[in-house]
Amino acid sequence: NLSEKQVVKSYSRGMRMKLSMAVALSHNAEILILDEATSGLDPIVREEILDFLLDFMQDENHTILISSHILSDLEKVADYIAFINDGKVLFVEPKDELKENYGICTLSNEEVENLDEEAIIGRRIHSFGQELLVKRNLVPDGIRLQKPSIEDIMIYFVKGGKR
C-alpha cells in the first residue's frame, strides 16, 4: 500500500521499512538482517511487518537475523534467541525451550543454601528470602517453579546476584 506518487523521503518510518523489505526481497534474498526493524513503528505497522516476516520464514530456505529490544516481537517471530550483553553471548537457545529450561522460585535463605549453586542463574534478595532464576533440571522436585518471561530471563542473566 505504498503510494507511487509520493516522494520516498516523505514516507513515514513504517512506509520506509515496508519499502526496504520490498527492495530486499526483489533480489530474491534468502536471508534478511534487520536491526531494530520495528522500533519506533506504530502498533498496526509493527504487526504488518511481523506478519510479513512470518510469511517470509514459511519457506525453509529463508532466514531472518533480527536485532531487537522489543521482546514481544521476538516472542512472535523468533525460532532461536541469542542474548548478547556487553559483547558477550550469554545464551543461544530455541525460544520455545528457553522458558522450559528455567524457572523462578521464591525461597527462604535456608532453602537457598540447600540448592546446588550451579542451579542458580540470578537472584533478587528480599527481607523474606530470595527470588531466584534457576535451571529447572538442577532443582529438586517439590520446589514450586513459575515460568519466566524472556525479559525475566535476560534480566536475571545480566543482574545475577547484584540485586
Question: Where are the regions a protein language model picked out?
Answer:
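A generic structural signal for secondary-structure junctions
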Residues: 1, 103, 158-159
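ABC transporter nucleotide-binding domains
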Residues: 1-72, 76-85
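C-terminal coupling/interaction segments
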Residues: 121-163
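ABC transporter nucleotide-binding domain
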Residues: 50-134
